[in-house]
Amino acid sequence: MNRTLMKNLMDYSVGSLAFFAVGFALMMGTSAYMLVGTEGFFLAGGAYDVGTMLTWFFMLVFCATAATIVSGAIAERPKFSTYVIYSAVICAVIYPIYGHWLWGGGWLSSADFMTALGGGYGALDFAGSGVVHAVGGYVALAGCLMLGPRIGRYNSQGKPIPIPGHSISLAVLGAFILWFGWFGFNPGSTLSAHELRISVIAVNTNLCAAAAATTAMFITWRKFGKADVVMTVNGVIAGLVAITAPCAWVAPWAAVVIGIVAGFIVCYGYWFLERRGVDDVAGAIPVHGLNGTWGLLALGLFADGTYGNYATETPFITGLLYGNTGFFACQLISVVVNFAWAFGTGFLLFYVLKHTLGIRVSPEEELAGLDICEHGVVTYPDFVYTEPARPTRIIRLSESVIERENEPKTGGKRG
């Protein structure tokens, strides 16, 4: 558990520095050929501009969110050192460049051929289903594939073996905190406190989360004979992710439909990946990746023409169900580009790290626990484990790792 907390601390700390030095300029700087920003490194030139500071801080929190998505998916097996490098790269390069294409005046939103196709506007993403969540989800997929499953996650026949989470109570508490926080995430993306659409966005956000959670609950109840708490929690987050792109442009009834579909996606997406050997500890890929994609497509389907593009003041955003086939095509293009960019760059990053520094701890360290092996602490120091309470082999492995770490260093480098 300490390892997960430490990764999240570094996602925000290292991510803040990386986004300050490089990421913000690539994302929001003056565009070069609508591909990447070229000005504003280290916030040079705008250090005392209130608007620049506010934009940097607002976008930073979104950036850190994308980084933390990967943390949950690849838990319990990556080296801490290489994880810190990953965190810096996603915040400095991967998230900002795709973000520039949609939010920084880049080609997906503003190129002539995209605006002509969409009927006056290119691809859109109100608050980050694609820019934040799908990017994080598909980088997580790349990380899971490169790392492989945890020891004991599958038997010799390849059948998945459940590994229970640390605390369902904390998971539910976290879901409620996220649910509440999303009312800053989505309504806050209006960038204006007097924007009247805030009320619609808040209602849509809540309805979609509720519909997705209820759907996930009924699916697991039907499948297992009992309503599954963890999958219902993932349903809440899946609904929040799915509504993040279309929240300003769809009607409340559409938000409910989007949430119902999100509930199906998170359940069956997780089981599909699990059967194929993808060990996604937190369900981040179906929650954020697949439902981030669904959010982009849902915008292209359900946008009802009652609200414009807040950035360009385009009056009416309409989707496929309201006769705008071209805008749905723009969203499809955005989905394909999103997956290709996030998964491609994520796979390349983890591949390079794997074949240089290494990305996975040793089997002994993994079994002993990364709290002890890489951070030198245990989560609950007052707990006393006896032989009957823990497998003997794991106790021996833990002791051997601790002894090895306490041996005098004789020079050389650990692989």
Residue ranges: model-predicted function:
Residues M1-G415:
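Glycine- and aromatic-enriched membrane alpha-helices
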